[in-house]
Amino acid sequence: GALTLDPELAMPDYVDTMDVHLMPGCWQDEHAEGDVAQGAIYAHGGQVFRGSLLPSKTRSGVAASVSKWLSIRYPEFKPEKILETGCTIGNNLFPYKDIYPDAELTGVDVAAPCLRYANARAVARGVDAHFSQQNAETLDFTDNSFDLVVSSFFFHELSVEATKRVLAECRRVLKPGGMMVHMELPPSSQVDAYYNFFLDWDNEHNNEPHYRDFRSRECADLMASAGFSADEYFTASIPDVGGADPAYFRQVALGEAEPPKHGIYTSWGLFGAVKAA
């Protein structure tokens, strides 16, 4: 895979004006030539969000769960080109190779240190993946380039206006008949008052200024603003594939059983679209 960096890329304000997650240097600060430090810090600093949930074979994460869900829900869908926006260090890009081994993977992010780290991880793991330093609001790919566009925990880091621009770009680069699947935190209208308080704590105390504004919006409205029709749009909630009984996971994927309530390594909330052919 190729690593393509753009040293002239302007950092968006929602990245450059604060240390998101209170992580010193955020994602993009560079301290030396070829620096990967912020990627490594993110890889380990992100563990704080697990709390006591240490990595294990029964916790697979977003991409493993989404790709498995896609393979069950849409068995004829075989994406040849997959794009992840806001890929950081590749955690939620690599697992798509397990389900779609022939797919070409591409990840974009504004942060060069994270992309260098992601590329090094891909090489070490033997995963063929391309990484490109781009702002997802203005992708340089041609129209109708990808079969599948994904993201994980991405949009709540952006302003709502930036989110709308990214979704419009996702639509532009998506092939007719292609699919877009974004995993995000649930809208405030879909959870109870305590869970809203629990999630909104980050908005006040963890340098997450766009968190509450994003969650106050309905995903259907955001999608409509990007040009997706109601017929194209969908939402879903799926269990984490690592911790779920395979038969139960399959039932949820097929709409034959209710998913568990939202929670890290319990259930993942999705929204997306199938672009009209």
Regions found by a protein language model. Name each.
Residues A226-A277:
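Core SAM-dependent methyltransferase catalytic element
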